[in-house]
Regions:
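PRPP-associated nucleotide enzymes
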Residues: 1-276
Length: 276
């Protein structure tokens, strides 16, 4: 594709390489480093004048450092006269801070509009109030199977106070669907709830496997047959200590989204058609 360049931040270079390979391209040259005082320095190693630039940086690892690196890369490309800069963020940082809670800020919107929103093309990811329910019913409709819902109430982060199962799972294989799992207390509690309600097996399908703190130990000790995640976050090291984790590559979806954006085609087409 002419007049397009793809750069990778430090967070997930393997995924960036897969995206570039699927587009038949090489990643652009960029050097990222830190000064002795831990400030981030970015040097774009080739001309981006008049180019349609895509920067791949996932919200994982050292999240704040990687976020700052992304914002600096965006600014560097704009200063170098790129015609357009698009941030490709497979796992969106601060996504759990997407609504007003007491006196706290809406951090997901703040960094987007205050940072990458000035200079980078962005689509603000505001989801519906009951996004999880919509997601699971959509999957159930496609597979022509029944669905149940688990309602959870939290008193504080990473701690579920109450969980209620709505639906019948007796003598059925249960598939838990959620957007992300961090310490995995919630999904492990949900798995126990399903088994106690009569499910024969339990699988989990998650978009983002953060797996921090006691997550791996909890999964290993839980009743899951498998925990399936995408590769928005690197999982190689965690898979070595947790054989239940399975990873689905989504580079083809991100590559097609980039191609469609570059060519001015519909990206919403991908909501119902998955490229292979």
């Amino acid at each position: 594709m002419p007049n397009i360049k793809i750069f990778s931040g430090s967070s997930h270079r393997e995924l960036s390489h897969k995206i570039a390979d699927r587009l038949g391209m090489e990643l652009g040259k960029v050097v990222t480093k830190k000064f002795s005082n831990q400030e981030t320095c970015v040097e774009i190693g080739e001309s981006v004048r008049g180019e349609d630039v895509y920067i791949v940086q996932s919200g994982c690892g050292e999240i704040n450092d990687n976020l700052m690196e992304l914002l600096i890369m965006i600014n560097a490309c704009k200063i170098a006269s790129a015609s357009r800069v698009t941030a490709v963020i497979p796992c969106f940082p601060y996504a759990r801070q997407d609504k007003k809670d007491k006196s706290g800020p809406i951090s997901a919107n703040w960094w987007l509009t205050g940072g990458s929103g000035r200079g980078a093309k962005s689509n603000h990811p505001y989801g519906p109030l009951h996004a999880s329910q919509i997601r699971v019913t959509s999957i159930a409709d496609r597979l022509n199977v029944d669905f149940a819902l688990i309602h959870k109430e939290r008193k504080r982060a990473n701690e579920v106070d109450r969980m209620v199962l709505v639906g019948d799972v007796t003598d059925r294989v249960a598939i838990l669907v959620d957007d992300m799992a961090d310490t995995c207390g919630t999904i492990c509690h949900a798995a126990d709830k399903l088994i106690s309600a009569g499910a024969t097996k339990v699988y989990a399908i998650l978009t983002h496997g953060i797996f921090s703190g006691p997550a791996i130990s909890r999964i290993n000790n839980a009743c899951f047959e498998a925990v399936v995640v995408t590769n928005t976050i690197p999982q190689e090291e965690k898979m070595k200590t947790c054989p239940k984790i399975q990873v689905i590559d989504i580079s083809m979806i991100l590559a097609e989204a980039i191609r469609r954006t570059h060519n001015g085609e519909s990206v919403s087409y991908l909501f119902s058609h998955v490229p292979l």
